[in-house]
Amino acid sequence: MFVNQRTRRPYMSVFVLVLGAAVICPAYGIIDRLVVQTSSGPIRGRSTMVQGREVHVFNGVPFAKPPVDSLRFKKPVPAEPWHGVLDATRLPPSCIQERYEYFPGFAGEEMWNPNTNVSEDCLYLNIWVPTKTRLRHGRGLNFGSNDYFQDDDDFQRQHQSKGGLAMLVWIYGGGFMSGTSTLDIYNAEILAAVGNVIVASMQYRVGAFGFLYLAPYINGYEEDAPGNMGMWDQALAIRWLKENAKAFGGDPDLITLFGESAGGSSVSLHLLSPVTRGLSKRGILQSGTLNAPWSHMTAEKALQIAEGLIDDCNCNLTMLKESPSTVMQCMRNVDAKTISVQQWNSYSGILGFPSAPTIDGVFMTADPMTMLREANLEGIDILVGSNRDEGTYFLLYDFIDYFEKDAATSLPRDKFLEIMNTIFNKASEPEREAIIFQYTGWESGNDGYQNQHQVGRAVGDHFFICPTNEFALGLTERGASVHYYYFTHRTSTSLWGEWMGVLHGDEVEYIFGQPMNASLQYRQRERDLSRRMVLSVSEFARTGNPALEGEHWPLYTRENPIFFIFNAEGEDDLRGEKYGRGPMATSCAFWNDFLPRLRAWSVPSKSPCNLLEQMSIASVSSTMPIVVMVVLVLIPLCAWWWAIKKNKTPPHPQVILETRAFMH
């Protein structure tokens, strides 16, 4: 026996090398269909039958050297080529991270925790390749039955380019602090089989291991802790997949990046970054875009967090300026578990994760909207989307003393105000008052359950839906073709309380085809919805348009911000329509248009009443929600400002609340 030092996997020496040559060399008269010759070396996967179709699966394919010892906190280094056939039949380790254990034994939480051992040696790929078994075209599918296949070549001819199959590359979420491609929910066998696409996923470093930023202290960007190492991991994985697409029967020009939450944000950065721009011309952004408040950070903030971690790890922060190499050697000697735990000391409240893509001037050259405004996205296709109740999951975790997982909570008005002020504590007082105005349930009086619902709405709108809308519109204005979906289906098998609605991440299982797994207890309509979403995503990967045969799915534009509704019942609370505008048009007009104008009034000498003059007639007429906000928010603020100007005691914020209530 010998051990491959790169993979640490044992092999029989001479016998396996000879057999490895035989299975891939026609001269021996033996062809092993499960062996693929990659640029790094040959790999052997496994075969599985899925939905009546054979899929070849390759797990644990290394694309980088293990980022351990001297490579900790550095950009990834490509994997050394190996000799002999690498065993690619086992799931790889997950990158170092902490588990969520707020609800021990609860499957709804456990499904997102790593299901393989965590390790710093974690930079591996997973790849699913459908064989040429023929899948019926979506146009002919009999929804409501399990007869998905037909014995002809139509589907294969229509859904494979001359260069090969389209490839979907998955990037997992987890707030850049957690996540792993090995989760059961990310098993892409069904997506590959039903969609007739190659699917790949990668591991990338999260937390401080992937985002520690000390560039100002280090001479030369290639040195320790340049920041964004996790993004460089993703970039190297994408390049490896593009280089090896043909080896798996794929088309290197038909690579679509798709991801959820932090994964969606990552996709949006790859489309804009000078490092990765051009590697893919299509992206799917699920509940995450780069401009979201949690999705990026300034170099100054990242540096402050890094300094705090060094101090918490007892690595003599005072020496960082004069001897950064000494400090970094200390950090490399710190136990990985210690770093993994101590980094959470910098968590700053709801969605205030201490790691995120950093504006380093190299991978991320400017703030997200500036990068977007400077981009030329002609020829880029985007599918973007949100879920109806994005905020409830995070609300529960950050305010676990207020809410229960299983049952709705009647939240008194004083607790509503307390939570809202805590969530938006970095906003100015006028901004916080405006936010409270916007999310007070005026129609329902002092309804505690409505208060809980409105706090969840505020979190979802601010951190997810409205940044997504803003980014989607920015993409269209830079030349991209954008389609928008809105996922509104509450899954019948959901383990979370009814009050939590359609949670952040609920669409993932449908896109990966999990409801089509007969062993799981989904309803037939949910299986149909999943199949429909799988086909839309696959069609988008091939053509850039998610619409199926005979279906109209309009482009998303500022003039017509139309989204397509994904719901198993074929209808939604939006009057049973398949389409809507927005989503959350009024709330997002507040966050994306009104609040920035209010924020511009940053000093007492500047009247908020001037905001009326700043708003063009065209702007106000095209967004009626702004008019409502002017009446319900700006007029009371004007009164407050005039009171200050006349040296009178300004009205208490509660008086302003009562003013709006009266006006309403």
From Swiss-Prot:
As its record notes, the protein acts as a catalyst of:
acetylcholine + H2O = choline + acetate + H(+)
Which GO BP terms apply?
Answer: acetylcholine catabolic process in synaptic cleft; choline metabolic process
> Which InterPro entries does UniProt cross-reference here?
AB_hydrolase_fold (IPR029058), AChE-related_enzymes (IPR050654), Acylcholinesterase_insect (IPR001445), CarbesteraseB (IPR002018), Carboxylesterase_B_AS (IPR019826), Carboxylesterase_B_CS (IPR019819), Cholinesterase (IPR000997)
Question: What Gene Ontology terms describe where this protein resides (cellular component)?
Answer: extracellular space; plasma membrane; side of membrane; synapse; synaptic cleft
Q: What is its main location?
A: other
Q: Is Iron-sulfur included in the keywords of this UniProt record?
A: no
Gene Ontology MF terms: acetylcholinesterase activity
Q: Which SUPFAM superfamilies match?
A: alpha/beta-Hydrolases
Please name the catalytic residues of this protein.
261 (acyl-ester intermediate), 390 (charge relay system), 504 (charge relay system)
Q: Which PROSITE patterns match?
A: CARBOXYLESTERASE_B_1 (PS00122), CARBOXYLESTERASE_B_2 (PS00941)
Lipid tethering residues (GPI-anchor amidated asparagine): 647
Localization annotation: Synapse; Cell membrane
Q: Quaternary form?
A: Homodimer; disulfide-linked.
Family stated for the protein in its record:
Belongs to the type-B carboxylesterase/lipase family.
Q: What is this protein called?
A: Acetylcholinesterase
* Organism field: Anopheles stephensi
